[in-house]
Every structure is written in C-alpha cells, then in structure tokens.
Amino acid sequence: MLKVAIVGKPNVGKSTLFNRIIKVNKSIVDDKPGITRDRIYANAEWLTQHFKLIDTGGLMLDEFDFKKQIELQVNYAITEADVIVFLVSYKEGINNDDHYVAKILKKHKNKKILLAVNKSETRNKDSYDDHEYLRFGFQKPYFISANHGIGIGDLLDAIVDTKLKEIKEEDTFKFCIIGRPNVGKSSLVNCILNEDRMITSNIANTTRDAIDSNFKKDNLLYTIIDTAGIRRKGKIQENVDKYAYLRVEQSISRSNLIVIVLDGSEEFNEQDEVIAGLAHKANIPSIIVVNKWDIVKEKDEKTMNKFIKTIRIKFKFLSWTPIVFLSAIENKRINTLFNEIKSIRENLNLKFNSKILTDLVFKLQMLNSPPLFNRGRIKINHVTQVDGQIPTFVLFCNNPEYLHFSYARYLENEIRKSLGLNNVPITLYFKNKTDKIRGKKNDK
C-alpha cells in the first residue's frame, strides 16, 4: 500500500490536514505547538485509491524538549513513506524552521515530495508569489486550506498518481493498550515492535495520541493501538487530556482485545479500577498485564499468587481475564503475553453446532433447573450461535422476560467453561421460541 507522510515545522496544520484527508479527528489538534509527538497512522482513500497516511511531530531548528525523539520519529516516517507532503504555512510565512525541514527532505532524493502551502484561504488566486516557494526546489507548490478544504482535491490527485504494486490487505487482529500514565504502555509497544516507535520518558503522558502500528507474528497480522494514559477525571484540565481521554474510548471501540497495563512496582489504585471498568463496559476480551515485574522487590514463589489474588478482588468484574506478568523494558515474558493473545484470537473465531449447544444447555438445566415463576417453569429448548464480535448465543425459551439474572449468569459461566472459552466474554440472548433470529447462524 502507498504510504504518505506529512512533514513540517510545528503548527503549520499537519494534524488538521491529516484529519481532513481521513475525515476523522484522529490526531489531536490544538494551537499549542508540539501536540503531535509520535507518528500516527491511518488508512485513507481518494478516487478508489487506498493509501496509508502518516502524521508526524513538528521539526524545528532550535533545541526543545523531545527534539531528538521527534526527529527520530520523523526520520522513521520519511524512510518508510513513498510520498512526502512538505507542509508550510502561507499565514505565518517562511522562516528558518521551514528551510531546516527542506534541508532534511533533500537528503531523500528517491522520494516523491509535494510542497503544500497551508492556511492560504486569504491568498489572491491571481497573485504571483510562487517564486518564494519554488526556492525550496520541490517543483510547483499546492496552495491549500486544511481547515476550509480548499485545494485538497488537487493535492490528493498528485498523491494517488504515484504508481505502486497493489498489495492485498489481510485480516488483522486489533488490540489496544490502556492504562494510567507512566505504567509502561509505550515501552511495551516498542518491545513488541522492536523499535523506538513511541517517545518514552519518565514524564507522565509522553504519549498523547492513539497510535496504530501494524506488524506480523507467526504469520498472523496484528494492529496494536497505544493510547494516552488516562488520568483521574478531576485532573483532566488541558484540552489535550480531554481529547486523549475520548481517544482511549474510541480506540477501545475499534479493538478486538484490550490490554490493561498495571505498574507492578506500585500499589494498584482507584484509577486502575476505573480503567479496568472501561474494558468491562466494552464487553470484549481483555488481558491484564502486570508490567515492571523486574523491579518488584522481594519476590518469591508466592509473590505472583499474591498479585493474582489482589487483582481478582479489585477487578472481580473481570474474573475471566488472563493475567500476565512481564517486564517490557527488559523484554522478559513477552511471549507469555502473545500466547494469551493468540489463544483469545482463536477462541473468538470458534463456531459451535446448534445441536452441541442445545444438548449442553439441556444438561445444564438438568443439573440446575431454571427457577419457577407464576406461570410455571422456564424451559430452554433450542440454542444457536450467531455472528458477533465475541461468541454470541441465542437461547430460545418460553417467557424469557421471567428469567432471573442469576440463572442467566449461571448459564453464561457454565457455557464458557464447557466450551473452553475461559479467556473471553460471551453474550447470551434469551428469546421467545416464536421470535426470529437476527444474524447469521453457525450450524455447520
């Protein structure tokens, strides 16, 4: 797939252009320079042509916090991109930072570089000011306004004009990594990808955007989504933190699996429980990762069991969730995490015959009869699986409105156990036997 990177100094509108092209507010946009620190990926389409778009942090000549890390991220993006959109601002004009970026880009002569002049909505179309931008040596400039959508079509025409061999996209399994700030989420991503994909430091919240990374392991495709650390709502004061909190919820909504990262070197707190609650609310599989296991003091053979017991008490609503102990910074026990991810992926794809399901539920009713109600006893006479993000089963019975939630929970736990679905949530729908099934059956 064609890869396109947007590069430029801070505050020229890179993230606004990124969002305009993908039609989603994926990058955090604010007037404050340096809001985008990592490189951010998204799929885009123009005139039926698909391409991968990359947003990057701003480059500056002067020294500033995270300069080396941001330059490393931008260089990664430039290296992997086929097309580079060099973005400058008509409103602010050209300065030394723009020439600094141009100097970096000129080292990549094998790349297609498109110069785009953003914030040009006030420019007179009849003006002859191209010469100022032609000095960069990147052919004619494209005058655009990312905010107003002006000139974007011409720029996209030039982007998709790049010829590449078509690569068929395969199914990918998406999982997001969530947790409070500084528990090691980005270190875990870097460990998995074997590169400094994220900017990491001891300063809380050095990752602000949700960032997608595609990779392959054991011939299976994955997309990993790293998110900003979630602070307590009372401490969310800056717009950036509010945006990041919403981005975490969006990341969860497009994931197949949630990895909840805890800091093993500190006591678990209320915010950890709030974050785990987001995973529970999403009703998709999750894994609890106890990170920084290398610096947990005075470990013995009982330490891990003590942690597990504490987690099961604090996060009792995630009783089925696997727990993994690892050290991202030392790259230890990472395979344990992937064994769980692979197992969950396989379980989500399992399909069960209706006869097997019906026989199972019949036996469960024999072992523990449904409670009585004023019209008699509820009887479940048929079960089928339908399509869903998690294993989803429809149980047909008489008077489902009288089924007590405790009996539904009994069936859910026993069905999960009997079918070997111990590490994923399942959904049960109780329908009147005269109701029609919505969704595709799995009766093979």
Swiss-Prot record:
KH-like domain location: 350-434
GO terms, molecular function: GTP binding; ribosome binding
Pfam families, alphabetized: KH_dom-like, MMR_HSR1
Positions that bind GTP 1: 8-15, 55-59, 118-121
Classification of source organism: Bacteria, Bacillati, Mycoplasmatota, Mycoplasmoidales, Mycoplasmoidaceae
Residue pairs linked by disulfide bridges in the UniProt entry: none
Residues in EngA-type G domain copies: 2-167, 173-349
GO biological process entries: ribosome biogenesis
HAMAP family named in the record: GTPase_Der
Organism of derivation: Malacoplasma penetrans (strain HF-2)
Name of the protein in question: GTPase Der
InterPro entries per the UniProt record, alphabetical: G_ENGA (IPR031166), GTP-bd (IPR006073), GTPase_Der (IPR016484), KH_dom-like (IPR032859), KH_dom-like_a/b (IPR015946), P-loop_NTPase (IPR027417), Small_GTP-bd (IPR005225)
Quaternary structure and interacting proteins, as annotated: Associates with the 50S ribosomal subunit.
Function in brief: GTPase that plays an essential role in the late steps of ribosome biogenesis.
Gene3D superfamilies: 3.30.300.20, P-loop containing nucleotide triphosphate hydrolases
Binding positions for GTP 2 per the UniProt entry: 179-186, 226-230, 291-294
Annotated keywords: GTP-binding, Nucleotide-binding, Repeat, Ribosome biogenesis
Extent of the signal sequence: none
PROSITE patterns, per database record: G_ENGA
UniProt record similarity statement: Belongs to the TRAFAC class TrmE-Era-EngA-EngB-Septin-like GTPase superfamily. EngA (Der) GTPase family.
